[in-house]
């Protein structure tokens, strides 16, 4: 029923079935296996002919595969765990605007994760105070600051004012530090036309990156913005706001690895991926599975990490995963070990909550990161020696020592809801 409803079938036989080749176009369920440890749950493998899908359209792909079938009365629950995108179809998508290597070349930063910070409070600041917070963070050692996902154009801070003050913060901090800086200017808007207008203004200001909420904004809007960013040299940061409504429950919806694959096809240079160690949901092996699906060219099937199919992206550029949500300096060794160099480690409260202010908060994060990268390059085990490495760095960084004292007892030890088992 699932295969039929998402391809050529309906609830009854219709006379127009005779006007086409149903055998050519229908979806086929080719394998069924029980879910281990569960009664009345099965994993079904369904294959669809490529001719059912419009080239280069994530919107059409999802409309077909996860359309009406999820509302069937006959089904108590239904979840899309994974998709295999054949190279023949993935080559019809242009993917990320630039990709990992081009971004590194634009920023001239290599050999370490990038550092970011979400400006808090996320709502309520005036544009001038918002820009001031960005400046203090960027001059303290950050690579990026960020609009939160729901910062668009509200009465207390209109988008054009925010863009101008953030651009000023970028240029001042670049002049002071000699490093290339950026701020994720959220271009998400109520219409595609308004979204592109905001991206155009960001380009005119000369900033390096804009941002989009790809699930609330929609895949059509996201792909539209991706094309503009590629044509105009802007990096594109993607926030996944609303994803947990879709992916968090184990028995209904779809897994985030599917949304991650869809984003890589639709286009984005960064996407939030969870942290494993922070405040947001995410089991380690499962998170690393879809992080590899975002970054790597070829990923082998590995059910232990939740990867149901071998995926070959051919020449499609990779996406940088962003670890963000409830992280602080004590998490730095684990984050460096888990995510590696091609990642963005984004500290919001873990920067702005520093007792001495924003710039010292960023200095603490930068020192902690540099210490972890140096220790890793020397062959030390970050998982086992992480706390020792951070304590040693505190001896020559009073900013880091103060941060460690503030957050020494902050932990988020909750069992994940969505697990591989």
UniProtKB/Swiss-Prot annotation:
Catalytic activity: 2 (2R)-3-phosphoglycerate + 2 H(+) = D-ribulose 1,5-bisphosphate + CO2 + H2O; D-ribulose 1,5-bisphosphate + O2 = 2-phosphoglycolate + (2R)-3-phosphoglycerate + 2 H(+)
Organism lineage string: Eukaryota, Viridiplantae, Streptophyta, Embryophyta, Tracheophyta
The EC number(s) this enzyme carries: 4.1.1.39
Pfam families the record matches: RuBisCO_large (PF00016), RuBisCO_large_N (PF02788)
InterPro entries the record matches: RuBisCO, RuBisCo_large_chain_AS, RuBisCO_lsu_C, RuBisCO_lsu_C_sf, RuBisCO_lsu_fd_N, RuBisCO_lsu_N_sf, RuBisCO_lsuI
Residues with PTM N6-carboxylysine: 146
Species of provenance: Aegilops tauschii
The entry's keywords: Calvin cycle, Carbon dioxide fixation, Chloroplast, Disulfide bond, Lyase, Magnesium, Metal-binding, Monooxygenase, Oxidoreductase, Photorespiration, Photosynthesis, Plastid
Cofactor note: Binds 1 Mg(2+) ion per subunit.
UniProt family annotation: Belongs to the RuBisCO large chain family. Type I subfamily.
Protein name: Ribulose bisphosphate carboxylase large chain
């Amino acid at each position: 029923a699932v295969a039929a409803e998402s391809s050529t079938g309906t609830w009854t036989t219709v006379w127009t079935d005779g006007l086409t080749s149903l055998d050519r176009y229908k979806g086929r369920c080719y394998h069924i296996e029980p879910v281990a440890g569960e009664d009345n749950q099965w994993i079904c493998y369904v294959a669809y002919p490529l001719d059912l899908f419009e080239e280069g359209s994530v919107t059409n792909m999802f409309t077909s595969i996860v359309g009406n079938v999820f509302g069937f009365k006959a089904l108590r629950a239904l979840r899309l765990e994974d998709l295999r995108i054949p190279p023949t179809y993935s080559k019809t998508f242009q993917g990320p605007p630039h990709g990992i290597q081009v971004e590194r070349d634009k920023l001239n930063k290599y050999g370490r994760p990038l550092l970011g910070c979400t400006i808090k409070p996320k709502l309520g600041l005036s544009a001038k105070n918002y820009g001031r917070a960005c400046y203090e963070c960027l001059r303290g050692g950050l690579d990026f600051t960020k609009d939160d996902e729901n910062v668009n154009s509200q009465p207390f801070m209109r988008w054009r004012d925010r863009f101008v003050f953030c651009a000023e913060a970028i240029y001042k901090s670049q002049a002071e530090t000699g490093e290339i800086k950026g701020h994720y200017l959220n271009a998400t808007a109520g219409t595609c036309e308004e979204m592109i207008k905001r991206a155009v203004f960001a380009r005119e200001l000369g900033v390096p990156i804009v941002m989009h909420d790809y699930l609330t904004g929609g895949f059509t809007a996201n792909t539209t913005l991706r094309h503009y960013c590629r044509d105009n040299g802007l990096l594109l940061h993607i926030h996944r706001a609303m994803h947990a409504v879709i992916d968090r429950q184990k028995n209904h919806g779809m897994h985030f690895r599917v949304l991650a694959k869809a984003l890589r096809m639709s286009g984005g240079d960064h996407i939030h991926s969870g942290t494993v160690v922070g405040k947001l949901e995410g089991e380690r092996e499962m998170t690393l599975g879809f992080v590899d699906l975002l970054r790597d060219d070829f990923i082998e099937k590995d059910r232990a990490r939740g990867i149901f199919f071998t995926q070959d992206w051919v020449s499609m550029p990779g996406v940088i995963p962003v670890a963000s949500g409830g992280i602080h300096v004590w998490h730095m060794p684990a984050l460096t070990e888990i995510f590696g160099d091609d990642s963005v480690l984004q500290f919001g409260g873990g920067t702005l909550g520093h007792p001495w202010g924003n710039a010292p908060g960023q200095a603490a994060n930068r020192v902690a990161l540099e210490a972890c990268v140096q220790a890793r390059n020397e062959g030390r085990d970050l998982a086992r020696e992480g706390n020792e490495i951070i304590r040693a760095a505190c001896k020559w960084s009073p900013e880091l020592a103060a941060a460690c004292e503030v957050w020494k007892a902050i932990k988020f030890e909750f069992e994940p809801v969505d697990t591989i088992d």
